[in-house]
Amino acid sequence: MSSPSLTLPSQERPAARRRLLEILGALAIAATYVYLVLNQPADITGGPGSASALIALTGFLAGAVLLIVAVLPTLPASTLVLIPVALVLNIVLGQFVGSTLVPFYLDAIGTVLIAVLAGPAAGAATGALSSIVWSFFNPTVLPFAAGAALIGCLAGLAARYGLFRRFYLAPVAGFATGIIAGVVSAPVAAFVFGGTSGVATGAIVSAFRAMGDTLLAAITKQALISDPMDKAIVFTVVAILVYALPRRARLQFPFVRRHRVLAGNTPVEAAADAPAQGPGHGPAQGTSPDSARKG
C-alpha cells in the first residue's frame, strides 16, 4: 500500500483559491447586474461621471479582475497576448455593425475566441473587460457587461464539453447561448435605456411596439430574434478561426489540450504534455515507438 501524498494539500490549495476567486468574480458581476435592473438608473448613459456609472464600472471591473487573477496562473503567454487583441476586435466590430442596418451585433467574436482557447473564466473576464473599455467611448454598453461575461462563460463551457469537436455543433451552441444572453440583456435594455442602441435592432423594437407590445415584451422578442442568430454566426466564425490555426499552435493552449476542445486532439496528443511515465511504461497502446518519439 502506498502512503498518502504529503504534497496533496499544498497542490489542492491553489486550485481551491482559484475556484474561490472565480466564484467571487461571478458574484460581483451578477450583483452589479441585479443592481442595474432593480434601480434602473437613467443617468448611467451620461458616462463614468455619474454615481450609477461608477457603481457599475466598479462592480464589473472588480468581477473581471477577480476572474483574471483566478485564471492567470494557468494562462500561457499566447493567451495573455490574445486578450487585448480580442478586446479591440469586439469593440471595432461592435461599433461598426451597430451603426449599420444589420440586425446583429458581432461584438463577441473576441470573447468567444478566448473562451474556446482558455476556458469559461477567461472568456467571462474578456467579455466584461470589453464592455468596460468600450464604455469609455460609448457609455451605453457598460450595463451589458454582465451579458458579455455570460456569453464568454457559456462559450467556454460549450468548448469544455465538446461542442466544438464537431463543426456543425458550434452554431447550435451559439444559438442556445444567444437565447440565454437575449433574455438576460432584455431587462437592461428596457429599464435602463428604454430600447436598444443599434440602428436595426431599434427598428425591430419599434415595429413590435407599433403592434401593441409593451416595451419589455418588444425588446425581449427583438433579442430572441437577433441574439440567437448573432451568436450562431459568432460561434461559427470562431470555429473557423481556431480550426484554421496549425495543430501545433492550437496545442499551445492548456485548456484545449486538457479538455480535448477540438477534433483531432486525441488522448495521445493530450498525453504529450503529461509528465513522463515511470520505468516499465511504454508508449500508449496503438502507437509505435517512432510516433511516440515524435510526440
Regions found by a protein language model. Give the residues of each.
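Membrane-embedded alpha-helical hairpins and interfacial helices in multi-pass inner-membrane proteins
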Residues: 3-61, 99-101, 141, 163-274, ...
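Short juxtamembrane and helix-loop transition motifs at transmembrane-helix boundaries
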Residues: 12-13, 39-48, 66-70, 89-90, ...
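Residue-level signature of the transmembrane alpha-helical core
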Residues: 84-88, 109, 113, 124, ...
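Structural signal for the C-terminal ends of transmembrane alpha-helices
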Residues: 65-74, 157-162, 241-249
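Membrane-helix interface "capping/anchor" motifs
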Residues: 71-79, 115-126, 163-167
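Interfacial aromatic-anchored transmembrane helix boundaries in multi-pass membrane proteins
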Residues: 91-106, 127-168, 198
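Helix-loop-helix hairpins and the membrane-proximal interhelical loops
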Residues: 60, 64-88
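Generic transmembrane alpha-helix motif of multi-pass integral membrane proteins
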Residues: 66-68, 107-123, 154-158
